[in-house]
């Protein structure tokens, strides 16, 4: 894919919100270049809100360019105020350092999981250079290039200042200087020519372009990605239970897969463009095939498979699909211990119990019945299954527990709960 094809593809996918002149970008990227995107450590894992910039780095990688993932070990100690309603809570240095390590490992694994050469990705920590800066030198050499008038006129800052109950601290106000310095440093050390980021980062990116020109005498470029919203206008990326994480110990591959599988018909083709490497022609073929198909579209399954494979690999995808099929068929007997652990994490309502607990009580505590009377009716009508076997007795749990610890309760075809026996060694 040549440079013109790369940027045409990005535009067709709707992945460019703002940029420096595209003609200059196309010309610049006609030869191999270096680009970067920053990720501040605000938790021990990235979430799906980080996927579009990660995949953008990957798209440039696949076109023969070198990607830098910058982990903000320094900037993460401050927090970006851009379009935030309140001052960020400051985390301890030890916490931030651990998160930096976690994110660096996670990003490296994601960006090299498809078999590419590790040399095409560089993960760096801006604490390695910002931590060595002398304060007076920074004010003299960097601070003098920033106009306070221009900084307070940024929309992201004006919104905070306009709120009578909120101001902005000097700590957060200085964030833009540090991010700008990152760009200048990466340009000087690695020849970095492009910074990408979310649409809320445009002001910081432009400041970095200006500072790089002043410090290094070099013209560099910037590009932002759109804010991803659903068809109803709401921000995409969270569920009722919170963020959807990329780390399997925080969001299981099964729950991750289900999240994409439940994409709305009005969103799914756009999401295929944003979150997969399928060509726009292939996506249009899927759309047309779905329009002719009687029944459920295939686009959601294709989306879920591609994104889950990218984040969790073939093994994670296979596990998510096995769990999905097991719950659909009602036969959970072939699930592995690790797959049942996924259901315990976030796949099903989970209730701790002992073997002597009444099934009536468990149906109540799990939410499968609203009263003992209703629970008895479900049992008498043969609507309750335990580990796939129909049960009509009210007594305690009996029979074979999966891996001596789990029972899957099922009411009807679609209502499930997981029972975990207490007091077992993990």
Swiss-Prot record:
One of its GO terms (biological process) is tRNA aminoacylation. ATP binds at residue 238. It comes from Vibrio cholerae serotype O1 (strain ATCC 39315 / El Tor Inaba N16961). Keywords: Aminoacyl-tRNA synthetase, ATP-binding, Cytoplasm, Ligase, Nucleotide-binding, Protein biosynthesis, RNA-binding. A motif ('KMSKS' region) lies at residues 235-239. L-tyrosine binds at residues 36, 175, 179. Catalyzes the attachment of tyrosine to tRNA(Tyr) in a two-step reaction: tyrosine is first activated by ATP to form Tyr-AMP and then transferred to the acceptor end of tRNA(Tyr). This is Tyrosine--tRNA ligase 1.
């Amino acid at each position: 894919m040549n440079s013109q094809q790369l940027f045409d593809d990005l535009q067709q996918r709707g992945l460019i919100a703002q940029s420096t002149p595209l003609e200059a970008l196309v010309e610049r990227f006609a030869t191999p270049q270096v680009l970067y995107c920053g990720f501040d450590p605000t938790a021990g894992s990235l979430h799906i809100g980080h996927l579009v910039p990660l995949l953008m780095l990957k798209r440039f990688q696949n076109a023969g360019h070198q990607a830098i993932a910058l982990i903000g070990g320094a900037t993460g100690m401050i927090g970006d105020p851009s379009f935030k309603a309140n001052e960020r809570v400051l985390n301890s240095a030890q916490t931030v350092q651990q998160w930096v390590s976690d994110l660096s490992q996670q990003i490296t694994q994601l960006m090299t999981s498809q078999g590419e050469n590790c040399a095409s990705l560089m993960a760096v920590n801006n604490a390695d250079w910002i931590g060595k800066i002398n304060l007076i030198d920074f004010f003299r050499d960097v601070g003098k290039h920033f106009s306070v008038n221009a900084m307070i006129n940024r929309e992201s800052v004006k919104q905070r200042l306009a709120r009578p109950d909120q101001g902005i601290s000097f700590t957060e106000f200085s964030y833009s200087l540090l991010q700008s310095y990152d760009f200048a440093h990466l340009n000087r050390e690695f020849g970095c020519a492009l910074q990408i980021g979310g649409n809320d980062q445009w002001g910081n990116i432009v400041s970095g372009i200006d500072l790089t020109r002043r410090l290094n005498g070099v013209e560099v470029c910037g590009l932002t990605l759109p804010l991803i919203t659903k068809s109803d206008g709401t921000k995409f990326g969270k569920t009722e239970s919170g963020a959807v994480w990329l780390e399997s110990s925080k969001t299981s591959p099964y729950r991750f897969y289900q999240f994409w599988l439940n994409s709305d018909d009005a969103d799914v083709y756009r999401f295929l463009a944003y979150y997969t490497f399928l060509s726009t022609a292939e996506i249009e073929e899927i759309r047309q095939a779905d329009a002719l198909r009687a029944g459920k579209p295939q686009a959601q399954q294709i989306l879920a498979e591609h994104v889950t494979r990218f984040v969790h690999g073939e093994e994670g995808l296979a596990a998510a699909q096995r769990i999905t099929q097991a719950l659909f068929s009602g036969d959970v007997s072939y699930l592995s211990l690790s797959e049942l652990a996924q259901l315990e994490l976030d796949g099903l309502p989970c209730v701790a119990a002992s073997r002597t607990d009444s099934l009536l009580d468990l149906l109540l505590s799990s939410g499968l019945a609203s009263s003992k009377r209703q629970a008895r009716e479900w049992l008498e009508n043969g609507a309750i299954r335990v580990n796939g076997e129909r049960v009509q007795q009210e007594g305690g749990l009996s029979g074979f527990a999966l891996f001596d610890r789990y029972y899957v309760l099922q009411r009807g075809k679609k209502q499930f709960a997981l029972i975990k026996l207490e007091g077992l060694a993990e």
